[in-house]
Amino acid sequence: VARRRSAGIVLYRAGDGGLEVLLVHPGGPFWAKKDLGAWSIPKGEYEPDEDPQACALREFEEETGTRLAAPELLELGAVTQRAGKEVTAWAARGDLDAAAVRSNSFTMEWPPRSGREQEFPEVDRAAWFALDEARTKLVGAQVELLDRLVERIAR
């Protein structure tokens, strides 16, 4: 079985209290009531023959509705999530209105075994978080990406 790989973008900006990062909350019934440890950087899976950086930019646009125009990307490397999925990320400096984020959607059977298909957004909301709060919101393995971001910017 090929390992599942995804690629994403850590969008960051200077906020009043220091660095802030944009995180997205997954849509759909499974995630509806989950908050701490449920948020993610905008990301998505890519095929083995696909360029991960191109995938990261495409997925960012699909999940936020915003295209990053010629961003200068800082490579943050890869982390492995609990289920074994590898996430490769790049950081980009930028700003967007988190309240205006609109993502693509997916279809699934809901409620389970009902035979009814429902459509849900890939991302139901996005928000800017200061680093300390972002660390509590992010899926565990992705916290390492924030540490790497801070290191890269400090150089």
What kind of feature is each model-predicted range?
Residues 15-18, 28-31, 47-48, 83-84, ...:
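Short, charged/polar surface micro-motifs in flexible loops or helix N-caps
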Residues 33, 49, 137:
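Residues that scaffold the ATP/ADP-binding catalytic core of kinase and kinase-like folds
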Residues 41-76, 130:
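The catalytic Nudix box helix
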Residues 118-124:
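Non-DNA-binding regulatory cores of transcription-related proteins
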Residues 78-115, 127, 149:
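Active-site-adjacent beta-strand/loop module that shapes the phosphate/pyrophosphate-binding cleft
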Residues 1-41, 90:
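N-terminal strand-loop-strand
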Residues 131-155:
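Charged phosphate-binding loop/patch that engages nucleotide di/tri-phosphates or the phosphate backbone
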Residues 34-36, 40, 66, 85-87, ...:
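Membrane-topology and secretion signals of cell-surface/extracellular proteins
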